[in-house]
Structures are given as structure tokens and as C-alpha cells.
Amino acid sequence: MKRLVIYFHYDPAGCIDTACRIAVQAVQKYGRVVFVTNGTLAPADRVWVRQSGAGRIERENVGFDVGAYREALLTLGREKLAEYEEIVLMNYTLAGPVCSLAAMFTAMDARPELDFWGLTRHYAMQSRRFGGAVPEHLQSHFIAVRPRLFNSDDFWNYWKEIALPASYEQSIIRHETRFTPYFAARGYAWDTYVQTDDLKPVFVNPIMACPRELLANRGCPFFKRRSLFTPYADELRRTDGLAARELCDYVTAYTDFPLELLLVSLLKTQPLSALAQNLHWCYPVGAPTGETPDLNELGLRLLHYEQPAADPVTDWYNRQAAANADTLLAEAAALFEKNPMLGVLSPSLPLWQGCTAARRAAWMREKDALAQEVSVPVGSDPPPAPNCGWVLVRESAFPDGIPACTSQRDAWKLALTAQKNGAYAAAFEPLTGSAARADILNEYETAAAQPAAVAKQLGRLVKHRLQK
């Protein structure tokens, strides 16, 4: 089949990371690729596109994927596109493939009754964020269209008349959730390669909610980058919160996809806290063995810094955590061998709620200045480490030398510097801490479900606001 793939890309620095290159090279086996980027490519990356044999369009960063697809289609033109048997609109938000694409294209080539098809679908739902009633639709990260559709006036009118989005939400409303029902209503037949109708009562967005299931059992060759950094509170409203960790464990164990290289790329563009929450960078360790590791031989260095002033209870728990960490030094050091990208490690924050409140308040005071100093993205949540005045670092994560670390601010800068260098920060805790964390969560969930607790919390919030 003569196929054209229009591949949309965006990177604020104009770089094409390994995951994008793998995807482009994979689809090139099945068609000609036109690489469309919203921005200006770095010189070396522009050379890579040329050497790959792909076409290239560099454009102003307007209109998100919608603008990129529209410009590519209108630039190539109706007459040129009529030479193809299938046109694929694909974007960089997919990572992979984790397996050969032959099965997917062979299966869909055997379905000539379809006028357009996609990799996955999103089921109908209600969403204020996305304009109310969201219909069932193909997800725009991969949509293939065939001649009866792309040679029609319907197709070209759609793209000529579409209003370019100015936000992610507008992109979903104006294109992703509209494309499928728009053409289905005009008599064009569609379906997905990955079949998930049995999951419809469970998840509206299976590729995000259960990516491991789709890869392991349903032949899906791609997963979403966003799985690794999506807002974790949103995930907990839809799932058990384990999707990203299970996905990464599967990809690492059962595929050849270089997940570590994707993580290096994401560390440059996503807050460390978002990645840490989704990937659960808090490691349980067993009882201390009493061994004393040779940190110099392991390329590690133990640093201590002064904790911010706090109330007596918070201060006591922080000091206890640091003292306990000293007894677990061998177990902590072993985590670096197991996790090659680990650069900064500390004990997890004590479960005492005052510790959490104090750390968050300090982070909110420092985060914007730290982001500017280190030039990495930060979120409203602090990194998972360092905590409690105790931090173990991998020397190779700091090729320019380990910065001085005498305060909590310095410690956060240490974690962000490691992030900039392609390493992550994590926490560790004894098994008793992990068990207690589960019990505390259960207690909070039970209490939060009580109407009296909700009313009491609202009263506290109102009182707090009035006192300000």
C-alpha cells in the first residue's frame, strides 16, 4: 500500500529525542514520512531529518497538532495526496513502537470497508473541561484516512474551515472529539486497531488507564508519553494509580524499547514531582544489615544539611528520620546499583503531617527562583528528595562537580541539577513506613467519606479565609 505519514513533532528546544526517532524510523518501513515541527529544529536535528529521507516542514508554533496537520495537508495539496492509498496523521505524544508494526498494518489493510481508522479510541463521557458531552472518538495521536475520505470535499472542507486552537482544551474540542463524529455522520466507516469495547464500562480512556493491558494483551504497539507525568490526582480519580509503574515495568522486562532514554528526555521537559508520583520513586528497604558500604568505591557521597526551623514535633520526626537513614546506608547505597538513573536519594518525608506542611510551604517560597536558576520545569509539589537533612548522591550525576549543600534550598537545587543532567531524585523508607503509609491512607479515605468531615473541613477553610 502506498502510504503517507504526516508526523507532528514539538520540542521547545527544537530537539528530536530518541523516542521520536524510533517512531519515525519504524513507520518509514510502511510509508513516506513528512516530519512537521511546530518551531525551529536545532541544526543537528534538521540534519537527522534530511538523512532519514523524510520530508520536513518547520512552522510557527501555533495551532498545536491541528495547525501542523492542516498546514502539511494544504501544503502538499489535494492533487498530490490523491496519489496515495492511505494517509496517517500521527504525533510525538506516542512512544514506541514496542513491537513490529507489521501486525497492525496487515490487520487494517485487510479491512477495506473502513474509510478511516485509528490506533485507539476514547469512550463517551461528560466533561466541563472539554465542552460538556464528549462523544466516542478516535484519539488524534494516530488516525489513518483512505481515498474515499481524503479525496472528498468533506475532508478538505473540514481542514480548510477548522478554527486553529489556542489551548490544549480547544485542540481536543475542535479536532480530536469532533473528527470522528463529523465524518461518521457523513457516512464514512471507522474503527480502531486496538479493540477495547470490553473495557468500555471500566475506563473511558484505556490507553492511559491500563496501558500495560493494551501492550501485553491487545497488540498495541505504542503508549502515551503522558502516562509517565500526567497529573496524579487525576489518575487517582480514574484508576488505582499504578498504571505508569506497571507500564514501565512491562516495557523494561518484555520489550527492547529504550525506556531510560525516554525518561532522560522527559526529565528535561516535565516536573520531577510529576514523574516521581506516577513512577513511585519511593523505594521500600528491608531491615539494616549493619554493613558499612565504601561510598568512594561506589561513586557515592553522603551529604548532610541544616533543616529549616520547625515546630518541636516536626523537628523531632525529621531528626529521627535522618538517624534511621544512617542505619540503612548500605540498603540505600544498593538502590543506586539497581537504578542506573538514580542520582539523588534521601529518606522519605516522615508521615507526621506537620512535616508535609512545612516542606510544601518552604517549596512554594523557593520553587520559582530555583526553576530559573537551574532551567528545569518545576511543579507545585516539591521533588521527592532530599528530605530530613540527609542526602546520598551519585557523583557521576554531577559532571561539573557536586554543588555545595548546606540548606534545604541547596538540597532542592541539588535534585534539580541532577534532573537537568538526566538523573532523578527518589526517597527510601523502611518496610514499616510503607505499611504505615497504607494504613494512614485508609484512615484518611474513611474519614473523608463522612459528611461531617466534609462539613468540618469546609468550615475550617471558610474560617481560614476570613482570618486572612
PLM region descriptions:
Residues 1-468:
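ER/Golgi luminal nucleotide-sugar-dependent glycosyltransferases, focusing on the catalytic module
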